[in-house]
Amino acid sequence: ENGKTFKVSDKVTVENVRYDNRFGITVAADMYLPKGLDTTKKYPAIVIGTPYGGVKEQGAGIYAMVLAERGFVTLAFDESYNGESGGEPRHVSSPDIFVEDFSASVDFIGTRPFVDRERIGAIGLCGAGGFAVTAAQVDKRIKAVATASMYDISRADHYGWKDSMTKDEY
């Protein structure tokens, strides 16, 4: 259904959106809204990063949909260089840019008039878990963070798989 790997709930509406991060890369996202959203009220929001190599039409979209059913405004996004987002070469890994994608997502969702800017959280799935935690450390607008099956790519890059590198090696 619309390229998604799951059936979209009839309790939400989905809008495909685009916005740029501070590196000038266009980020593609799906914004999920509770059906019947009252635009005169303020709702908590959550931005959701995909597993490394995944796309918003998979796991991140499922999280976004279920949380929107529960009253959150959610944004499942494709990290730069992946999915429908921009960036060349494709499928490259860039922790600093992936962290910025979380902040750019907060920028975008925070400009929606129905979002409570004091109640924005982030979820990172798998590899995006480390990026979500780092984004929450540097972007104080992110008031809560959660991960699922987190893998810290930055730590693995520095210290080796399961911290296997000695100090002389790094």
Predicted regions and their residues:
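N-terminal cap/lid segment of alpha/beta-hydrolase-fold proteins
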Residues: 2-41
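Active-site glycine-rich loops that stabilize anionic/oxyanionic intermediates
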Residues: 22, 43, 50-55, 126
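Structural cue for short, hydrophobic secondary-structure segments
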Residues: 48-51, 76
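The serine-hydrolase catalytic nucleophile loop
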Residues: 53-65, 79
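Glycine-rich "HGGG/HGxG" loop immediately N-terminal to the catalytic nucleophile
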Residues: 58, 81-93
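Alpha/beta-hydrolase active-site loop
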Residues: 59, 92-113
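Conserved alpha/beta-hydrolase
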Residues: 66-86
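Primarily recognizes the serine-hydrolase "nucleophile elbow" in alpha/beta-hydrolase
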Residues: 104-170
